Amino acid sequence: MKKIDIIGENYFGKWDRTRTSCRGIIINDNNILLSYETLTDTWMIPGGGLEENETEKDCCIREISEETGIIVETSDCLLEIDEYYENYKFINKYFFCKPIEKTEIKLTENERRVGMTSRWLSVTKAIDIFSKYDFYKNNDEEKRGMYLRELTSLAELL
């Protein structure tokens, strides 16, 4: 498994907080399933935080199910991208996923508030969206970093 570090411009030089997330890449006929926040106009690869006593694969399966309503099978972890912002280290584990069946979407209160939905986009369109990460350099470091992370994951895995 390859590991890549992304250092944010606002990184303090050391971290004392860590969050691990697991993300699933689902491809079908050269389209990729992405999560989309309608309120913030933000795209991302589906996934979320690892819970206590949960395996990374189980986290990926749960998060994709909750956000997209699709139950998946996962590969082993193929890529880890560690991001450093302020005093945080964000560990992102990426998996390839295969859809198995549909289930009920179970969004968190925050995901409902930002209007999260899932949408299929061409891989080319997704890469185009994420490649504009530098547009957010001076006004939204979180979004800039997220788009750089997602672009990096697609460049490494596709």
Regions found by a protein language model. Give the residues of each.
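Short acidic, glycine/proline-rich loop/turn micro-motifs
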Residues: P46-G48, L107, S131-Y133
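Active-site beta-strand termini and strand-to-loop segments that position acidic
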Residues: I26-D29, C97-P99
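Active-site-adjacent beta-strand/loop module that shapes the phosphate/pyrophosphate-binding cleft
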Residues: E83-K106, R119, V123-T124
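Conserved Nudix-box catalytic region and its N-terminal flanking loop in Nudix hydrolases
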Residues: I27-E66
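A short coil-to-beta-strand element that immediately follows conserved catalytic motifs
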Residues: I71-E80
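Nudix hydrolase/Nudix homology domain
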Residues: D41, E111-L158
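Acidic, metal-coordinating catalytic segment for phosphate/diphosphate chemistry
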Residues: M1-R23
